[in-house]
Structures are given as structure tokens and as C-alpha cells.
From Swiss-Prot:
Protein name as catalogued: Putative annexin A2-like protein
Biological function: Calcium-regulated membrane-binding protein whose affinity for calcium is greatly enhanced by anionic phospholipids. It binds two calcium ions with high affinity. May be involved in heat-stress response.
Alphabetical GO biological process terms: positive regulation of receptor-mediated endocytosis involved in cholesterol transport
Top-level division of the source organism's lineage: Eukaryota
Annexin repeat spans: 33-104, 105-176, 189-261, 265-336
GO molecular function: calcium ion binding; calcium-dependent phospholipid binding; cytoskeletal protein binding; phosphatidylserine binding; phospholipase inhibitor activity
Gene3D superfamilies: Annexin
Signal peptide as annotated in the record: none
Length: 339
């Protein structure tokens, strides 16, 4: 079974320099995987009186994404029905959201979250910002392709019709996924020049030359920008984040802050987002679910360690305190353990 799957994977990845599943993911491929058996067990769980949610959660959260795609295929072949719609009828609430999210490929998931953030009245800017600011070039290019496939329109077109001004310019530039890749050569002259340009375009003058900020922050590689933000402190009395707070407001401020934090330390950025989703009264489940689903195979172990370091208690502990039932169980499986 796996060999056929491996061949299919290789074929679909040709010309796509895909990184191997991350060593820092909390969800790994299940060793004794059998798509047919999983599909059958899910089918039985759905038909059980009152729905056997535990079995569904156990299977879906303990398989990696490629394996879930095999289960979707096997289920369809077995029952002539789509697994997603069967589970949609069987489950409800936040648990349904988690499980349906896990059945999509990463790009389908991001594309559907982006579409949802721009649908109907008003835009959910926070979701738009989080996804667009935190994905790699390769991820963004795949999202653009899948978005067009799913919605018969370009992601860029939807962003343009849903946003305005400099915020729109920043989102459009980021969504292209054309940031320079990490070079092996460190260009100290350019680092210094960029740091000075960011200062000259903002804190140093009256008003802000936002296009200058956008071009540097969306075109340069991440390691380069990390050094630029360090160098920036030798020109400006404020660090980059403080400068943003002083210079711009609203969605644009929010977007630049997210972008800089994610450039400085991506796992810490997600740890902060997770903490914010659970602190105080009530839970921002949409954010919690999206990060747990989308980072579980990427960098969840790094996120967990940043979370514990900064907030003193584990992410696992926070999820336990903040959620309940099978929804909680699903999130804890994705978290992958206590620290």
C-alpha cells in the first residue's frame, strides 16, 4: 500500500521541492496504517447510535495528512459518499470544525480559511493577516493554486475587493509569495542599508513612507530581515515593533506587527497567538483550532517549547483548562503531549 502511495506522492511533488514532514511536528505518520480499516471503522463509528466520536477523533488526529487523504479516498470508494459530508452530518460544534479541517490538505485548509475570512459582510482581518503573514513562499504559491481551483477566482482578486489602502498593498505583496529565499551569503551592506531605509521611511520623518516599508518587509528573506531588525536599533531610538506602533494604525499596524513578530520568531509568534486565544474569559476557538490544525505537522514542538518558556505552564495545560469533551481530546492529540 505504502509503495503505491509513495509513488503517487513523488509524482505529485515533482518540480515541487517539498520539505520532508517536519521533525518538529507533533503529528507523525501512523506506523501500522491501513486506510481500508480506518475507513471501515469511521463508517461504523458514524452509524453507531449517538455517534462514536471517540473512535473518529482517535483515527483522524493520529494519522498524518497524507494518510488522511488515503482514508478519504478509501471511504469514498467503500460507501460512494464523501467522508467530509458524512462527518459534517455526524458531528457538530468545535469538534466538527477540527475534524473537517484535518481532512483537508494544508493548502485546501488555508484556502478555505482565507475564503471564509473574506466572505459576506466585513472582513475577518485577523485571520487574513495570520495566514498571509505566516506562510512560506512555497505554501503561498500552493495556496494560490488551490484557491483558484476551489473558488474559480484568484486569491489576489478577493483580497483586492475586500481590503483597501496600504493594508491592501501589504496583503497583496505578501500573498504573491515572492520573498527572497534564504541565501548562503550574508550581505552586510544591504542589511545596513535596509535598516537605515526603514528608519528614514518611518520614525525619522514626518509621516511614513509605507510603500518603502512594504517593499523591504515583503521582498527580503527572513534571515536577512532578522538581521535588519537588529541593526535597526542602532539607528532608531525605538525597536521595529515600537516604531510600527508609533507610525501606523488599524489593520495596517496589526499586519506589520504580526509580520515582524513572525519574522523574528515564528514558533513564538504562534505561541503568543495561542495564549491570546485562551487568556481571560471565553476562548477564541477559531484561532485556537486553526493554529492547532495547521501547525500540528509543521512546528508544534517548537511552539510548545516557546509557550512553556514564556508563559510558565504548558500549552497542554492551557488547552485542558479551556476546552472540554471530545473537542478537548482532539486538540490534546494535536498538541502531542504535556511539557
Amino acid at each position: 500500500m505504502s509503495t503505491v502511495h509513495e509513488i503517487l506522492c513523488k509524482l505529485s511533488l515533482e518540480g515541487d521541492h517539498s520539505t520532508p514532514p517536519s521533525a518538529y511536528g507533533s503529528v507523525k505518520a501512523y506506523t501500522n496504517f491501513d486506510a481500508e480499516r480506518d475507513a471501515l471503522n469511521i463508517e461504523t463509528a458514524i452509524k453507531t447510535k449517538g455517534v462514536d466520536e471517540v473512535t473518529i477523533v482517535n483515527i483522524v488526529t493520529n494519522r498524518d495528512n497524507a494518510q488522511r487523504q488515503d482514508i478519504v479516498f478509501s471511504y469514498q470508494r467503500r460507501t460512494k459518499k464523501e467522508l467530509a459530508s458524512a462527518l459534517k452530518s455526524a458531528l457538530s460544534g468545535h469538534l466538527e470544525t477540527v475534524i473537517l479541517g484535518l481532512l483537508k490538505t494544508p493548502a485546501q485548509y488555508d484556502a478555505s480559511e482565507l475564503k471564509a475570512s473574506m466572505k459576506g459582510l466585513g472582513t475577518d482581518e485577523d485571520s487574513l493577516i495570520e495566514i498571509i503573514c505566516s506562510r512560506t513562499n512555497q505554501e503561498l504559491q500552493e495556496i494560490n493554486r488551490v484557491y483558484k481551483e476551489m473558488y474559480k477566482t484568484d486569491l489576489e482578486k478577493d483580497i483586492i475587493s475586500d481590503t483597501s489602502g496600504d493594508f491592501r498593498k501589504l496583503m497583496v505583496a505578501l500573498a504573491k509569495g515572492r520573498r527572497a529565499e534564504d541565501g548562503s551569503v550574508i550581505d552586510y551592506e544591504l542589511i545596513d542599508q535596509d535598516a537605515q531605509d526603514l528608519y528614514d521611511a518611518g520614525v525619522k520623518r514626518k509621516g511614513t513612507d509605507v510603500p518603502k516599508w512594504i517593499s523591504i518587509m515583503t521582498e527580503r528573506s527572513v534571515p536577512h530581515l532578522q538581521k535588519v531588525f537588529d541593526r535597526y536599533k542602532s539607528y532608531s531610538p525605538y525597536d521595529m515593533l515600537e516604531s510600527i506602533r508609533k507610525e501606523v494604525k488599524g489593520d495596517l499596524e496589526n499586519a506589520f506587527l504580526n509580520l515582524v513578530q513572525r519574522i523574528q520568531n515564528k514558533p513564538l509568534y504562534f505561541a503568543d497567538q495561542l495564549y491570546d486565544s485562551m487568556k481571560g474569559k471565553g476562548t477564541r476557538d477559531k484561532v485556537l483550532i486553526r493554529i492547532m490544525v495547521s501547525r500540528s505537522e509543521v512546528d508544534m514542538l517548537k511552539i510548545r517549547s516557546e509557550f512553556k518558556r514564556k508563559y510558565g505552564k504548558s500549552l497542554y495545560y492551557y488547552i485542558q483548562q479551556d476546552t472540554k469533551g471530545d473537542y478537548q481530546k482532539a486538540l490534546l492529540y494535536l498538541c502531542g503531549g504535556d511539557d
